């Protein structure tokens, strides 16, 4: 005979264990974790009121623990709400973290980590070849053939090191959006200006008439955090929603870090909301499944090709790669005027973001656009990598 008291204790313990949130072990062996910094994601269906109540409770718990133990943790830093996907980032002591994990409204918690650009600077002044390549089936042409609508009426968010919005290549089409990295609203690195010029520059870009928004999530050294990137994505979705341009927007993320479920969830929500999302596969010549946001199934993950239609030696590969695009020795704008040449999957991704905006301008649906680009693409890449597509970006020009 089962003792009812014992059974009730067992069931209570089981229920408590079942309610405890998951602490996700993220990244790969080279990931740089940020000590005592955590991203907390709420369960689907948690209302805004319940979320606010939870945040208030956590702030109170942290304040009590900090006073009791004299820790130097900062507590709550920023909140996220991407189409009802709710969460926050904070700097918490172990006791506060335990309280968070035991809250039944929390889905999972992961430690924040460093994220970096996916570009490699090379020499200045080299000739660019990517525009000609993506508008011709055969390699070798320097002519870019495209519909003159060129992304008109579409907005591209450059989630990066910032953008020199006054550069002549943008002709007044660029504006500053937000900065989650630091207090300096400028591109002190050059990476973000280069990628923006590739996706929408007048001289160097794919979608020459698209609007451009600078979303700074990485600092002058090219690094940032997963939480900062999620905050940038949060801004993009809310801005597009407020401006009524969901379905007429694209986003480029030429960056990456170790695997992060929260990062993947954030870009997935953006994609599902009606923003076409292109991301860099990464530059370690490894399987992109171990990187985020490259491993998110919903986004368009881009590997890098050379002028000879080979996989760039540095490019990540694998089954999560959706498409190849030019990424070696790409010339585009640099802050302050003029141009420079960079290489990386960072340079490949904005070709696809720009092509996404170009196609949206012609009536394509952002939600199914990556599949459309894969259908149009040319099966041209030699030695693409294990279990990796050989398809190279093409704009359907007929050339």
Curated annotation (Swiss-Prot):
Main location: secreted
Coiled coil start-end: none
Record-level GO cellular component terms: extracellular region
Location of this chain's protein in the cell: Secreted
Molecular function terms, GO-annotated: serine-type endopeptidase activity
Any matching Pfam family: Inhibitor_I9
PROSITE patterns tied to this protein: SUBTILASE, SUBTILASE_SER
Glycan attachment positions: 102, 252, 308, 395
Gene Ontology BP annotations: proteolysis
Propeptide residues according to the Swiss-Prot or TrEMBL record: 20-118
Keyword Cell membrane included in the entry's annotation: no
Residue ranges occupied by any Inhibitor I9 domain in the UniProt entry: 38-117
Family in the record: Belongs to the peptidase S8 family.
Name the record gives this protein: Subtilisin-like protease 4
Organism, scientific name: Trichophyton tonsurans (Scalp ringworm fungus)
Gene giving rise to this polypeptide: SUB4
């Amino acid at each position: 005979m089962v003792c009812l008291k014992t059974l009730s204790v067992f069931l209570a313990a089981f229920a408590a264990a079942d309610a405890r949130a998951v602490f996700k072990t993220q990244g790969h062996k080279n990931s740089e974790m940020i000590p005592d910094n955590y991203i907390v994601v709420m369960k689907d269906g948690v209302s805004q009121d319940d979320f606010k109540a939870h945040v208030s409770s956590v702030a109170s718990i942290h304040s009590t623990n900090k006073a009791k133990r004299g820790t130097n943790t900062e507590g709550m830093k920023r909140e996220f709400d991407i189409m009802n996907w709710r969460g926050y980032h904070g700097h918490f002591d172990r006791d506060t973290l335990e309280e968070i994990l035991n809250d039944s409204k929390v889905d999972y918690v992961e430690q924040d980590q460093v994220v970096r650009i996916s570009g490699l600077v090379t020499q200045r002044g080299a000739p660019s070849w990517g525009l000609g390549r993506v508008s011709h089936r055969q390699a070798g042409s320097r002519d870019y053939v495209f519909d003159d609508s060129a992304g008109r009426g579409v907005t591209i968010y450059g989630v990066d090191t910032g953008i020199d919005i006054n550069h002549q290549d943008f002709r007044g089409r660029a504006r500053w959006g937000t900065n989650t990295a630091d207090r300096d609203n400028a591109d002190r690195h050059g990476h973000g200006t280069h990628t923006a010029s590739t996706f929408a520059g007048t001289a160097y870009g794919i979608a020459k008439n698209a609007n451009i928004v600078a979303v700074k999530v990485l600092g002058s050294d090219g690094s940032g955090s997963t939480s900062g990137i999620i905050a940038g994505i949060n801004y993009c979705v809310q801005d597009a929603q407020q401006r009524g341009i969901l379905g007429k927007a694209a986003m480029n993320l030429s960056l990456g870090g170790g695997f992060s479920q929260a990062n993947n969830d954030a870009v997935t929500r953006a994609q599902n909301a009606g923003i076409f999302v292109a991301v860099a596969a990464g530059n370690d010549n490894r399987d992109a499944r171990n990187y985020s946001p490259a491993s998110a199934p919903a986004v368009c993950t881009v590997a890098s090709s050379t002028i000879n239609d080979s996989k760039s030696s540095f490019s990540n590969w694998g089954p999560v790669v959706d498409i190849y695009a030019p990424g070696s020795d790409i010339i585009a704008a640099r802050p302050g005027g003029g141009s420079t040449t960079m290489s990386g999957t960072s340079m490949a991704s904005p070709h696809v973001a720009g092509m996404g905006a170009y196609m949206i301008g012609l009536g394509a649906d952002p939600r199914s656009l990556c599949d459309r680009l894969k259908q149009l693409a040319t099966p041209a890449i030699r030695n693409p990598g294990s279990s990796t597509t050989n398809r190279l970006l093409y704009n359907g020009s007929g050339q």
